[in-house]
């Protein structure tokens, strides 16, 4: 089975599919033993079991799976993780080799259980900025009203608006519009929110009812109601929203208390619905300028912080704001509340400081120029996408456990989660990412959320080759399904352990998974380390990997060869070095936070597109589009290029193609093939947009156009103003840059890898 089949079957891709059997040998592989796992990956044939799982005795708690040894006569099973012998329950008495339950069938390495405990209905609390211009506010209101039709009728909904003040709208009050106003320059605790809203009476809806529905009665029912009871009132409030009345002078920014509004939203939820899956959805059209969490003062003469100021620690408000939002993130994760941030303006809204909110809770980040754009509208609509059974494709209040067999230990996780501080003997001393635990919490989880898990080989001493058992890993994901069921997704995988030096180790290397996993480590390091240090670390790891696994003679660069399953890895690292994930120049702190958030969320395929974008070429000589090198030599006057960077989709018309189009050849009947050529990349774009979240920015440009820079910045500059004609081909573009080319990069890599003193 190849790597893609493993991913299709279980949503798992390992960096190494054969693992060295000792810790010292495993450390020599350079790339850690690690895996990318998509817990809720959509599978059309996924067994959904309507009974409780059978778990091993404590402290193991691994779930019965197809790798267990089952003694049908004794009605017992042996756990492959701790080797304990367990009795099968009475309901398994009729099983035979021909009639096995799904969890014991070899092909069912991933199953999902529907648990008997009900889950509460989901909660959606909108937090809306009213300091917007009339056009932007109208577009936002209209689309929020349209979005109500996408939310399940039994979901609870609420609304908070903010400008200079924050207002909690009492949508349960029928007589007229009513709201509770909070000052925008003050930090409110959850207790103060509770008292001011009158929520300090005993509330009976903290525990789900029999059917799994939280009782929306008592004081909280004034603010959070089932959509079927509140849609009319909420629609009226949204349609009646007006621009914040606080006056704004020409030389000042609007007074915007974003931090206070978010704090009140979390306070309302944690006092009324603790540990119930909820989404706080923030729609912001500018920077917070008031109260806790402000990132810039109201005077326009004070510029918004840049990367340079943040690095030099001269950004006036950034550190305090970051600390404030980290405190909110901790509160949100404690009670299972996800925070989504939608930015609808050209300016920054403080995503850099707020990044801990979506990063810790699994919320979404969407960055667009205005709420009237298709990027915002399509992205918000896709958030509420339904599955084949018409349920929302999102889970709430999830926990994620990794159970390894005794041969492996868990080093950590990188993804949108927080530690549950569950320390046990399977936790490694080495920490990568969020470590020192084998259990994490995800307040929100979707079929797109992918997590990087890292492992350490436990054994210090080697074992004779024929006696090494395989290593097992079980991933357990408990979550609240949007149907108000609690579910458990179980994936169990086995990997061969082999002695150090075994050729199977090198042949089992998955260069695509390794590139994404190493990128996640680099991004995790970037939160605390200097950018140049991370670049040096990336280069050092690449050189060490090549020294270990390349075929070469010492001090002879011309003899350097990489096996086919290593050959693309240096190329991935070259494009990573040039990417917006590590190179923050020309990006705002908000943009950098957005890009890194998306990479830490997406699956392997989408992550690779972010690291090394794809480029397709269309021409009259080719019936089908052809993948071409991400290189300046691919730009030709009689070709159309389609670039997909995940964040941007760009159609680039060569000079000749653009001239023909401008002369209107596509409108003439005898040039129907040219009209089809112009249309072909647009049809491909439509296919790309179907599953993409958030919606990418679409760019249509020509050779010499100002927006062609988006393409040129991603291409390998093999033909520059400084290079001689040895590189490139006649008619290819010249890129004006001082960046080194892939050819130069590979030449230096080969020299350093074969050097005896390295």
Curated annotation (Swiss-Prot):
Binding site for Zn(2+): 56, 60, 79, 82
One GO-annotated biological process of the protein: COPII-coated vesicle cargo loading
Disulfide bonds: none
Entry keyword set: Cytoplasm, Cytoplasmic vesicle, Endoplasmic reticulum, ER-Golgi transport, Golgi apparatus, Membrane, Metal-binding, Protein transport, Transport, Zinc
Pfam family, one: Gelsolin
SUPFAM superfamilies found in the cross-reference section: beta-sandwich domain of Sec23/24 (SSF81995), C-terminal, gelsolin-like domain of Sec23/24 (SSF82754), Helical domain of Sec23/24 (SSF81811), vWA-like (SSF53300), Zn-finger domain of Sec23/24 (SSF82919)
GO molecular function: GTPase activator activity; zinc ion binding
GO cellular component: COPII vesicle coat; endoplasmic reticulum exit site; endoplasmic reticulum membrane; Golgi membrane
Membrane topology: Peripheral membrane protein
Location(s), subcellular: Cytoplasm; Cytoplasmic vesicle, COPII-coated vesicle membrane; Endoplasmic reticulum membrane; Golgi apparatus membrane
Subunit structure: The COPII coat is composed of at least 5 proteins: the SEC23/24 complex, the SEC13/31 complex, and the protein SAR1.
Family, similarity comment: Belongs to the SEC23/SEC24 family. SEC23 subfamily.
Function of the molecule: Component of the coat protein complex II (COPII) which promotes the formation of transport vesicles from the endoplasmic reticulum (ER). The coat has two main functions, the physical deformation of the endoplasmic reticulum membrane into vesicles and the selection of cargo molecules.
Protein name (record): Protein transport protein SEC23
């Amino acid at each position: 089975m190849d790597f893609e089949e493993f991913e299709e079957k279980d949503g798992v891709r390992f960096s190494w599919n054969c693992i060295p059997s000792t810790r010292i040998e495993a450390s020599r592989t350079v790339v850690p033993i690690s895996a990318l796992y998509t817990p809720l990956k959509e599978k059309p044939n996924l067994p959904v079991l309507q009974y409780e799982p059978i778990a091993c005795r404590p402290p193991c708690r691994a779930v019965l799976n197809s790798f267990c040894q089952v003694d049908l006569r004794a009605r017992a099973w042996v756990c492959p993780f701790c080797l304990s012998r367990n009795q099968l329950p009475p309901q398994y008495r009729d099983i035979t080799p021909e009639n096995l339950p799904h969890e014991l069938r070899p092909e069912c390495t991933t199953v999902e259980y529907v648990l008997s405990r009900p889950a509460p209905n989901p909660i959606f609390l909108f937090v809306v900025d009213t300091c917007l211009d009339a056009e932007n506010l109208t577009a936002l209101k209209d689309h929020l009203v349209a979005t109500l039709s996408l939310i399940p009728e039994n979901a609870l909904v609420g609304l908070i608006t903010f400008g200079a003040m924050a207002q909690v709208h009492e949508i349960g009050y029928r007589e007229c519009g009513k709201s509770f106003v909070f000052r925008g320059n003050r930090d409110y605790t959850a207790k103060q929110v509770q008292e001011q809203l009158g929520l300090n009476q005993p509330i009976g809806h903290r525990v789900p009812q029999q059917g799994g529905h939280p009782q929306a009665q008592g004081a909280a029912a004034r603010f959070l109601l089932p959509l079927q009871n509140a849609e009319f009132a909420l629609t009226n409030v949204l349609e009646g929203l007006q621009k914040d009345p606080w006056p704004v002078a020409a030389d000042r920014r609007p007074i915007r208390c974003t931090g206070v509004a978010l704090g009140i939203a979390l306070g309302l939820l944690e006092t009324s619905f603790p540990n119930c899956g909820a989404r706080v959805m923030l729609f912001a059209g500018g920077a917070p300028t008031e109260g806790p969490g402000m990132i810039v003062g109201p005077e326009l003469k004070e510029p918004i912080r840049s990367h340079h100021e943040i690095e030099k620690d001269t950004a006036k408000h950034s550190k305090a704001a970051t600390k404030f939002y980290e405190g909110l993130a901790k509160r949100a994760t404690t009670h299972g509340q996800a925070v989504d941030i939608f930015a609808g303006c050209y300016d920054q809204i403080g995503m850099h400081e707020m990044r801990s909110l979506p990063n810790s809770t699994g919320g979404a980040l969407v960055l667009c120029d205005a709420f009237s754009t298709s990027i915002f509208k399509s992205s918000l609509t896709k958030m509420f996408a339904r599955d084949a059974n018409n349920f929302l494709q999102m889970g709430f209040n999830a926990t994620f456990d990794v159970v390894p067999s005794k041969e492996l230990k868990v080093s950590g996780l990188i993804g949108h989660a927080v530690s549950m501080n569950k320390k046990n003997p399977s936790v490694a001393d080495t920490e990568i990412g969020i470590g020192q635990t084998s259990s994490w919490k995800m307040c929100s989880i979707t079929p797109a959320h992918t997590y990087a898990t890292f492992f350490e080989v436990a054994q210090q001493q080697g074992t004779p080759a024929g006696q090494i058992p395989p290593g097992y890993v079980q991933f357990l994901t408990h979550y609240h399904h949007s149907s108000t069921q609690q579910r458990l997704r179980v994936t169990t995988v086995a990997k061969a352990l082999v002695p150090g030096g075994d050729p199977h180790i090198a042949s089992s290397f998955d260069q695509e998974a390794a590139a994404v996993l190493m990128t996640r480590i680099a991004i995790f390091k970037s939160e605390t380390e200097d950018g140049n240090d991370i670049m040096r670390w990336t280069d050092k790891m690449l050189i060490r990997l090549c020294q270990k696994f390349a075929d070469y003679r010492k001090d002879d660069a011309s003899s350097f060869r990489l096996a086919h399953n290593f050959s693309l890895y240096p190329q991935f690292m070259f494009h990573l070095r040039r990417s917006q994930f590590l190179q923050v120049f020309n990006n705002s702190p908000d943009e950098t936070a957005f890009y890194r958030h998306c990479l830490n969320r997406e699956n392997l395929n989408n992550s690779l597109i972010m690291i090394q974008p794809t480029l397709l070429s269309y021409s009259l000589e080719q019936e089908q589009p052809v993948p071409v090198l991400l290189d300046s030599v691919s730009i030709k006057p009689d070709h159309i290029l389609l670039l997909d960077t995940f964040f941007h989709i760009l159609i680039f018309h060569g000079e000749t193609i653009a001239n023909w189009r401008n002369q209107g050849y596509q409108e003439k009947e005898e040039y129907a093939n040219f009209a089809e050529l112009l249309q072909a990349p647009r049809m491909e774009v439509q296919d790309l947009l179907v599953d993409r979240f958030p919606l990418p920015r679409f760019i249509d440009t020509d050779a010499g156009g100002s927006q062609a820079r988006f393409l040129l910045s991603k291409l390998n500059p093999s033909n520059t103003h400084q290079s001689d004609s040895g590189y490139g081909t006649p008619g290819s573009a010249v890129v004006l840059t001082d960046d080194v080319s892939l050819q130069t990069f590979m030449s230096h890599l080969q020299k350093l890898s074969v050097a005896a003193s390295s």
